[in-house]
Regions:
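Gly/Gly-Pro-rich "capping" loops immediately C-terminal to redox-active cysteine motifs
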Residues: 152, 175-182, 218-260
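Axial heme c-ligation environment in periplasmic c-type cytochrome domains
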Residues: 171-174, 225-230, 247, 264-297, ...
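Extracytoplasmic entry segments of secretory-pathway proteins
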Residues: 1-112, 197
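Electrostatic cytochrome c docking/interface patches
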Residues: 101-104, 183-210, 301
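Membrane-embedded segments
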Residues: 82, 92-96, 104-182
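The canonical Cys-X-X-Cys-His
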Residues: 163, 209-220, 261, 277, ...
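Detector for the c-type heme attachment site
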Residues: 164-167, 216-223, 235, 266-268, ...
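Sequence/structural segment immediately N-terminal to covalent heme-attachment motifs in c-type
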Residues: 198-223, 227-230
């Protein structure tokens, strides 16, 4: 892509410079009634401006053809690729690593320099999985259809992912993050996701968590995975894909992960209209305690 753009920019500059020079140098001057020298043709110039474009097309065409044929490769059985099952929900994303025994939500963590093999489907309506800075998009079609795509991140960083198909009132809020880390960090993250997680020491809060949260969500080896897995939620960039987690004072409109969890638990519909999570009947003290516990679920990788 960079090579192609560079070639195009160079060609455009050369053409415009020559065109500008010719227009100025050979313009009709006031009082000049003469007829310019008539040129029938110039074989040398014609050969030059025929051969040069051919060479440029070959330079651009070879990597293009290689890239196009590369798209036909199937990495679903490649032992060196990271296999990820992506499931789109209204209005969140589920990421399962079937070969690693890990399932998470809203943040896709991948190793740099490794082929990522994605199998995408939807749990409800039409969505589209899109990471603008890393890959193209692939639709998740209803009816049990599975679409595939492959990509590779060449450097570490955090990238924004989005749903690229109108899917309901909170379509614009259906964002997710992609974290690209080195291979060692990725391996530590996988191990951390599998570690057992202790419930709150306060038995009342532990009971509330079991009855109100773990009937839909999973935390470590506890609960069920019907809805977003909450393991390591304290380390995530956002809550609900919308509330950005930050403690930095310059971001006055955002909140800490604990504050954002309180906001979400109190009234999910106010944050993300149309979400399937209901407003749970909890006291402020219970919400505070659960938010504090969840905010403490951090992963060290």
């Amino acid at each position: 892509m960079k090579l192609t753009i560079t070639i195009m920019v160079v060609v455009v500059l050369i053409v415009f410079v020559i065109a500008g020079y010719v227009i100025i140098r050979y313009r009709r001057r006031p009082g000049d009634k003469s007829i310019p020298v008539q040129v029938e043709g110039n074989h040398k110039l014609e050969i030059i401006w025929t051969v040069i474009p051919i060479i440029l097309l070959i330079i651009v065409g070879i990597p293009t053809v290689n890239s196009v044929f590369g798209l036909a490769k199937d990495y679903t059985k490649d032992p060196n690729a990271v296999q990820i099952n992506v499931t789109a929900h209204q209005y969140w994303w589920e990421f399962e690593y079937p070969n690693l025994g890990v399932k998470t939500a809203q943040e896709l963590l991948i190793p740099e320099g490794t082929i990522i093999s994605v199998e995408a489907k939807t749990a409800d309506v039409l969505h589209s999985f899109w990471i603008p800075s890393l890959a193209g998009k692939v639709d998740t079609n209803p009816g049990g259809n599975v679409n595939r795509m492959y990509f590779k991140a060449d450097h570490t960083g955090v990238f924004l992912g989005k749903c690229a198909e109108l899917c309901g009132p909170s379509h614009s809020l259906m964002d997710f993050k992609v974290k690209v880390v080195d291979k060692a960090s990725f391996d530590r993250w996988v191990a951390a996701m599998k570690n057992p997680v202790a419930l709150p020491e306060d038995q009342e809060i532990a009971t509330v968590l079991n009855k109100q949260c773990l009937t839909c969500h999973a935390i470590g080896d506890k609960g069920v995975q019907l809805y977003p897995n909450l393991t390591g939620i304290g380390s995530r960039e956002s809550v609900g894909g919308k509330l950005i987690n930050t403690d930095q004072p310059e971001y006055a409109n955002e909140g800490s992960v604990e504050e954002n969890l309180k906001t979400w638990i109190k009234d999910p519909q106010a944050v993300k209209p149309g979400t399937l999570m209901p407003k749970v009947d909890l006291t402020d003290q219970q919400i505070d305690a659960i938010a504090k516990y969840l905010a403490g679920l951090k992963l060290d990788y």
